[in-house]
Amino acid sequence: MKPNIHPDYGPARIICACGNVIETRSTKKDIRVEICSQCHPFYTGSRQRVVERGGRIERFRQKYGR
């Protein structure tokens, strides 16, 4: 590898909207995600629906009142 052309690779934190924090390594310091393995229904086994920010159709209807 050529010296001094690669980004710094160091400790990073992945922060989920549920409050879970995962320590890892990356070229970015903090990474924010909406869902992780602690709150995703597939991993938790719950059948509840995931809270969404709104799909494209719903946002269109809100914007144009249809």
Curated annotation (Swiss-Prot):
Gene3D superfamilies the record matches: Ribosomal protein L31 (4.10.830.30)
Origin: domain of life: Bacteria
Cofactor binding, note field: Binds 1 zinc ion per subunit.
UniProt keyword list: Metal-binding, Ribonucleoprotein, Ribosomal protein, RNA-binding, rRNA-binding, Zinc
Entry cofactors: Zn(2+)
Parts of the chain that traverse the membrane: none
A GO cellular component annotation in the UniProt record: ribonucleoprotein complex
Cysteine disulfide partners in this protein: none
A biological-process GO annotation: translation
GO MF term (any one): rRNA binding
Residues in coiled coil: none
Binding site for Zn(2+): C16, C18, C36, C39
Family to which the UniProt record says this protein belongs: Belongs to the bacterial ribosomal protein bL31 family. Type A subfamily.
Functional note: Binds the 23S rRNA.
Quaternary structure and partners: Part of the 50S ribosomal subunit.
Annotated protein name in UniProt: Large ribosomal subunit protein bL31
Organism the protein comes from: Moorella thermoacetica (strain ATCC 39073 / JCM 9320)
